[in-house]
């Protein structure tokens, strides 16, 4: 079953995100630390008439890494070529992409951690010295061809920075950690989206949506669409605080931005394991989810919000989890 709070793209969201995409850093809401650093590095590169150093953007899904890549290219005034790690299946695919670059272009590789190692190794000399050596022919007739490349900027995006090899990670001169958004920034994003799509919304409703969006613009915009639908059918089309509360209750999204799966995780820990510690594998089996799904999709937000702690012996539900789900604290094992 698809979760309304899933960070990954759903349905027509890729098209919608392109419509909403800001063009320049001054239009980009949130991620101030990353923006401020990039602003300096971009201006310095332009003053020297050089390509920007290679950039690695990392963080959870839905926080604007792809958007930031397009913004960087716009700020530099260059073209952006886009691909993804899984799409580059062999070294020849990457060679064709690199050979097509113009001087100063940006090459954006999403999910860069999923590139095959043979492909990754081709990138090393391309990133460091702007050349590649490729083998032409086969057997006794094969020969190495040295191919010079124009200076370019590689922007890699990943949700799993720890999966990058050390040689690849070391070749990125600039790193940007994309963090969960603050409520004020998300509120502004919701109101901007409402304005672009001509939705009538009151500020209190935008604020409530922001609070329940798990710090993620993609989720905020998705919830906004569903609340708009509810307001059109159950009200007069205006997205009010009352309409927002009722719609999100229908969608099982509570005031902390937790849905039924998040609550199931916490209830399992509390009811079956006295709050923990419980191993991730055991927990995954009990809620009928894959271990990687729990670790990548559910756990980060629960930890960030203080509902779960990681310990050497397993995961532990915090007092905040007990209070949120209205369990008496005297049932918690010390």
UniProtKB/Swiss-Prot annotation:
EC number(s) stated in the UniProt entry for this protein: 3.6.4.-
Give the GO biological process terms. Answer: DNA recombination; DNA repair
Q: Which reaction does it catalyse?
A: ATP + H2O = ADP + phosphate + H(+)
An annotated Gene Ontology molecular function: ATP hydrolysis activity
Principal subcellular localisation of the protein: cytoplasm
UniProt keywords (A-Z) are: ATP-binding, Cytoplasm, DNA damage, DNA recombination, DNA repair, DNA-binding, Hydrolase, Nucleotide-binding
Q: Where is this region: Large ATPase domain (RuvB-L)?
A: 1-181
Domain of life of the organism encoding this protein: Bacteria
Entry GO terms, CC: cytoplasm; Holliday junction resolvase complex
Cross-referenced SMART domains: AAA (SM00382)
Q: Where does ATP bind?
A: 20-21, 62, 65-67, 128-130, 171, 181, 218
Q: Its quaternary structure?
A: Homohexamer. Forms an RuvA(8)-RuvB(12)-Holliday junction (HJ) complex. HJ DNA is sandwiched between 2 RuvA tetramers; dsDNA enters through RuvA and exits via RuvB. An RuvB hexamer assembles on each DNA strand where it exits the tetramer. Each RuvB hexamer is contacted by two RuvA subunits (via domain III) on 2 adjacent RuvB subunits; this complex drives branch migration. In the full resolvosome a probable DNA-RuvA(4)-RuvB(12)-RuvC(2) complex forms which resolves the HJ.
**Per its UniProt record, what NCBIfam families does this chain match?**
PRK00080.1, ruvB
The Swiss-Prot or TrEMBL record describes its family as follows: Belongs to the RuvB family.
Q: Under what name is this protein listed? A: Holliday junction branch migration complex subunit RuvB
Organism per entry: Streptococcus uberis (strain ATCC BAA-854 / 0140J)
